[in-house]
Amino acid sequence: MSGFGDRLAGATARRGPLCLGIDPHPELLRAWGLGTDAAGLAGFSDICVAAFAGFAVVKPQVAFFEAYGSAGYAVLERTIAALRESGVLVLADAKRGDIGSTMAAYASAWAGDSPLAADAVTASPYLGFGSLQPLLDTAREHDRGVFVLAATSNPEGASVQCAVAPGAIPGRTVAQAIVDAAAEVNAGAARGSVGVVVGATLSAPPDVSALNGPVLVPGVGAQGGRPEALAGLGGARRGQLLPAVSREVLRAGPDVAALRAAAERMRDAVAYLGENP
C-alpha cells in the first residue's frame, strides 16, 4: 500500500479537495426524522455513506458515535468499513492525545489493525508533540495518516495556541511549533503523511509552507469559513489544503440525492484549491 500522503493526493486530484463530515448531532437526527438512538445513528450513517460514495475524504466525528456506547462504536466500525469499501478515504475525527502506553493503545485502536482504524486520524499534541510518537510510529507502519491539531477556530484555543513558549524562537507561537514539528516528521518524503489542522476562520494562521503535508481546514460553510477565501491559507501551496464541511452539507438531508447535490456544490466551490483544477 502506498503512503497516506500519496493516496490523499491521488484521491483529491481525481475527486476534488473536499472532506465531508458525518456529524450525527441529535438535532440533525431529529431534523431527518430519525430517532436519537443507535438505530437513528445507523440510519443517518447509512444515508451519508450512500450520498458520499465517490468523494475523496469523509470524516466521521467520533464523539457523536461514542455517545451511544458500544452500539455507537458498532455503527462507527460498520460506517468506516462501508466508506472504505466504496473507495473513500476515511479520516476518524477522534482527537486522541495521551502519553506512553496509553497513547500506544490509542494508536493501536485508531491506526493499527483495529476495526476502528481508518485511513487517518486526528490527534491532539497538547501534552507535547513528542507524546504523539507512538501514534506516528503506528500510523507509519500501517501506511495511515495523522492530522495534528495546530490552530483551531474556537476562541478558547488562542490562549494556548497563540502563546509563545519560554526560550522559543522570538515570535514563534505554540501552533507554529506544532506545524514545524510535523514538518520535521515529513522531511524527506515525497508527500508527507502527517498533516495539521488549521481553522478556516483564523485571521493569522501559522505558516504551513514548509510542512510538506496536508492541511485539514474545518469550519467551512455554516461555521463561517468562506470557500472562496481559502487560497494560500498560511502560505499553503495548491493541492495542500483540504477544506472540511459538515453542517452546510448535512442540513440538505435526509434525501440522498439532495445530500449528494449539496456535497457536489461545495466540491465545485473549492475545486480551485486542487493541483489540477
Curated annotation (Swiss-Prot):
Give the top-level enzyme category. Answer: lyase
Superkingdom of origin:
Bacteria
Q: Name one Pfam family in it.
A: OMPdecase
Q: What is its EC number?
A: 4.1.1.23
Q: Among the record's GO biological process terms, what is one?
A: 'de novo' pyrimidine nucleobase biosynthetic process
Q: Does the keyword section mention Lyase?
A: yes
| Catalytic reactions of this protein | orotidine 5'-phosphate + H(+) = UMP + CO2
Q: Which residues are responsible for catalysis? A: K95
Q: Does the keyword Ribosomal protein apply?
A: no
* Pathway connected to this protein: Pyrimidine metabolism; UMP biosynthesis via de novo pathway; UMP from orotate: step 2/2
Task: Provide the alphabetized UniProt keywords.
Answer: Decarboxylase, Lyase, Pyrimidine biosynthesis
For this chain, one GO molecular function annotation is: orotidine-5'-phosphate decarboxylase activity
SUPFAM superfamilies this protein is in?
Answer: Ribulose-phoshate binding barrel (SSF51366)
Identify the InterPro entries for this entry.
Answer: Aldolase_TIM (IPR013785), OMPdecase_AS (IPR018089), OMPdecase_type-2 (IPR011995), OMPdeCOase_dom (IPR001754), RibuloseP-bd_barrel (IPR011060)
Q: What family, per the record?
A: Belongs to the OMP decarboxylase family. Type 2 subfamily.
Name of the protein this chain belongs to: Orotidine 5'-phosphate decarboxylase
Gene name of this polypeptide = pyrF
